[in-house]
Amino acid sequence: MVSFDATEALAPYREGRGYGAIVFDRERLRQADASLFSPQSWGDRARPVDKGGRGGAWFVDAPFGRSVLRQYLRGGMAARVSRDRYLWKGAGRTRSFAEFRLMRELIKRKLPVPRPLAACYLREGLGYRAALLMERLENVRSLADHAQLAGRGAPWEATGQLIARFHRAGLDHPDLNAHNILFDAGGHGWLIDFDRGVLRIPATRWRERNLKRLHRSLLKLRGNRSGEDVDKDYERLHRAYELAWGRGY
């Protein structure tokens, strides 16, 4: 359940034959329009993010701070039908608005996530396109990078503890992979990419599903490391997770 947030503002807009809306953090942005979500409008202040995901993301040097712009893109078989259009089910169920509000709720619960700044959708007929703008985390490296560079020295225990903390709050992260777990040089961790995420009553089934998803991604991204080495590292992560879960944090 995502609670009401009085600092959230809403602005309708039109573009061509479509119509949509922008939700934004009015403590960070005085106003918002569609240009926020166009990398072309940022010119040389926007540059593509080249690691992880399906593309469609840019680092943006904005007046309100260094940010990340992400356009929602489909993968797999669905991308053959449309790369960037989703079936309209109502404004509150758009991918962008749902993720924006979920991230704000996680921040209220004192969890380490990037601060969302604005989200939009543009509806045309039965479909819509969407985008999200959020603050950029500085000087961080993904668990995927740590695993490639440090192997056994990567922050496996810290990762398990971090995931347990989010699970204790009820976050079901359907795309928990090694690119979506970040650490800075001081060992502080964050989770990112909450598309299709949801808050649930903590239960073993969905928690284990998240962890299995992470395990598969570690095996996929192992590079020259053996599957046996990856499994041993994952066991360290899982043990730390279970200990943290048992302690209640």
Curated annotation (Swiss-Prot):
* The protein's Enzyme Commission number: 2.7.1.166
Task: Write out the pathway annotation from the protein's UniProt entry.
Answer: Bacterial outer membrane biogenesis; LPS core biosynthesis
Annotated signal peptide: none
Gene Ontology biological-process entries: lipopolysaccharide core region biosynthetic process
The record gives the membrane topology as: Peripheral membrane protein
Subcellular locations according to the entry: Cell inner membrane
**InterPro entries named in the record:** KDO_kinase (IPR022826), Kinase-like_dom_sf (IPR011009)
Its chief place of residence is: membrane
List the GO cellular component terms: plasma membrane
Q: What does this protein do?
A: Catalyzes the ATP-dependent phosphorylation of the 3-deoxy-D-manno-octulosonic acid (Kdo) residue in Kdo-lipid IV(A) at the 4-OH position.
Q: What is this protein called?
A: 3-deoxy-D-manno-octulosonic acid kinase
- Gene source species: Xanthomonas oryzae pv. oryzae (strain KACC10331 / KXO85)
* Classification of source organism: Bacteria, Pseudomonadati, Pseudomonadota, Gammaproteobacteria, Lysobacterales
As recorded in Swiss-Prot or TrEMBL, the protein's gene is named kdkA
